[in-house]
Design a protein with these regions (language model features):
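Membrane-proximal, proline-rich intrinsically disordered regions
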Residues: 22-85
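Hydrophobic alpha-helical elements and their junctions with loops/disorder across both membrane
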Residues: 18-19, 60, 200
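Intrinsically disordered, low-complexity, compositionally biased regions/tails
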Residues: 16, 32-34, 276-278
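Long, intrinsically disordered, low-complexity segments
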Residues: 20-24, 281-284
Length: 284
């Protein structure tokens, strides 16, 4: 009799565990809290990363950032490329005149250019890549690819070889790609991104609209921007590789949506994604 009771008790425990296992996930889910799946569907999970990447293409901040972003832009770009191009002149005498504006390069200023044009957006790009693969949202990763190339082509043109084709991989040492390899990879990535977003644009779809501070999720405008970026890269390599340059220049110009041709196409950040941005040049 004692053994029979033990078997009954054991059977009851097993049955109870089966019922509780069925309800475990439901019982342990907060009905008032957003799940990961909901976050992806609404763009919350990657939306912040998209905005962060946009703010890193050309360093830009808000009032909440005080002058941090302005100072970063000044050191990374204004005291180097902006000045060397002849668009701006400086009225300060940093390092007793031995600074980038007099072609005496300061290591910390050069490092700031690399950090702001390459390193800053890497973590956001990796997050979008991982999430888009898990949730099968290639259109969001396509946007991230366009933003990445918008920033990294400046690094490539300023420093030469950069880690590109293996960037973001979990390895102790990431190899650098030659300029030719990096440019070709950028063309390939841009082509893939444009193809994906073109389909979405033809469907009239928007993506991460609440977090896109540039075009508010307008996929058609992103395609035109990406085509314009492709044309710009093609012109950059025209003397080094005329055949490749012609191929991608024609591809950009002959695309259904073409390139940017009017003021309404411009990619600028003044207000968007719930923020008001400061114009670095006005403050400098």
């Amino acid at each position: 009799m004692k053994k029979i009771n033990q078997y009954k008790l054991l059977a009851g425990i097993c049955a109870l565990s089966l019922f509780t296992a069925c309800d475990f996930e439901e019982l342990n889910t907060n009905p008032f809290e957003m799940t990961d799946e909901m976050g992806i569907r609404d763009g919350v999970a990657v939306g912040g990363a998209v905005t962060a990447m946009q703010r890193a293409v050309v360093t830009v901040g808000t009032q909440a950032d005080d002058t941090e972003a302005i100072n970063q832009y000044q050191v990374a770009y204004n005291l180097s490329a902006d000045s060397w191009s002849g668009f701006f002149g400086q009225n300060n005498n940093w390092y007793s005149g031995s600074n980038n504006t007099t072609y005496y390069l300061q290591d910390n200023w050069v490092a700031a250019t690399y950090t702001n044009s390459y390193t800053t957006l890497l973590s956001s790009w990796k997050k979008i890549k991982q999430e888009s693969e898990k949730t099968e949202t290639p259109e969001i990763f396509a946007l991230a690819q366009i933003l990445k190339i918008s920033a990294w082509h400046k690094t490539l043109e300023s420093f030469g070889p950069i880690p590109y084709t293996h960037a973001g991989e979990p390895a102790l040492v990431i190899p650098f790609d030659s300029e030719q390899v990096a440019f070709n990879a950028m063309f390939t990535d841009l082509t893939a991104a444009i193809d994906i977003l073109t389909v979405r644009a033809e469907q009239g779809a928007t993506i991460v609209a609440d977090y896109d501070a540039v075009y508010a999720g307008d996929t058609r405008k992103w395609v035109k921007y990406a085509n314009s970026l492709m044309l710009r890269l093609a012109m950059r390599i025209s003397y080094a590789d005329e055949t490749t340059a012609q191929k991608y220049a024609r591809q950009a110009l002959n695309h259904t949506f073409g390139v940017m041709t009017s003021k309404s196409d411009e990619a600028q950040m003044s207000t968007g994604a719930g923020m008001v941005f400061r114009n670095n040049i006005e403050w400098l």
